[in-house]
Amino acid sequence: MRAASVPIDVRATYIEYMDINLTHPAPAFFISHGAPTFAMQPGQLGPVLTAAGRRMGAIKAALIVSPHWMTQGVRVASTPAPDTIHDFGGFPEPLYQIRYRAPGAPDWAAHAVQLLQSAGFAAEPDAGRGLDHGAWVPLRYLLPEANTPVFQISMPRDFDTAAAWRMGRALAPLRAQGVAIVGSGSLTHNLYEVFHGGKEAPYAQAFANWTSQAVLGGDIDALLHYRAQAPSAERAHPTEEHFLPLVVAAGAAAEGEQAQLLPGGMTYGVLAMDSYAWGLPLPEAA
């Protein structure tokens, strides 16, 4: 991790990454970002993400969709040096000292705006937005050197699974150009039970198992209609915003592209951390 005192030559870094020669399309990911403390407590998922980042190889940029930035219409962050946003309260002080100093990707952001507008989204650039914890916390593990250009895309307030799928399809061409697409959310997200229960609840694992079966089986219809089909869907997700980035990531996958499970286990008894990747090179055989 780059120390906060080391400056970044943003333009030089951006040009360096624009010149990368690709050997394969950049992957798409859904990452469960858990609680903000995941930034300091890697648990099972942290090392899995770091290994995935190494297998990913060279990419030109990373685009990340987080449920912690919701707007009227869609906003695409175009700042050349995004700040680290600590959009949470009541956590240990060292968490607020963490900075993720990756350069931004304004040219890629402009391209993403065009793709989204062509797909019917009311998309606009946002030159002032930094990276919220739904973005920088998982990126600390996936791209720990913080030298890959990154930019964030908001979720519209009226987002649903159909719109999330459409967003993923609209952004999918970026993968062939070397931009990794990351949907950051949570496989389960009942915060009341996290803070008031803390005990293992079987429904959370049942929902996680159902979702993995749908993702790994390529059952897009199930994901689009998870609210009616998944066990305990409304308990696992009292609100939808942390599930929808999964649908964005699945939408960015090529037709028939096989997903990989990135196992993350269960935290706080009910917060499932399993994540997924599409187009990620498989680990080399031992």
Segments predicted by a language model, with ranges:
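Short acidic (Asp/Glu) patches
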Residues: 45-50, 94-98, 130-137, 164-167
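Beta-strand elements within well-structured catalytic alpha/beta cores of enzymes
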Residues: 27-31, 61-66, 153, 174-187, ...
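Flexible, glycine/proline-enriched loop segments at strand-loop-helix junctions
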Residues: 95-103, 125, 154-161, 233
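A short aromatic-anchored loop/beta-hairpin motif
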Residues: 18-115, 119, 123
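Internal, conserved structured core segments that host functional sites
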Residues: 109-163
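Surface-exposed, charge/polar-rich loops and edge strands
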Residues: 114, 118, 148-149, 159, ...
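Short, positively charged and aromatic/hydrophobic N-terminal segments
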Residues: 7, 14-16
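Extreme N-terminal basic, low-complexity initiation segments
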Residues: 2-8
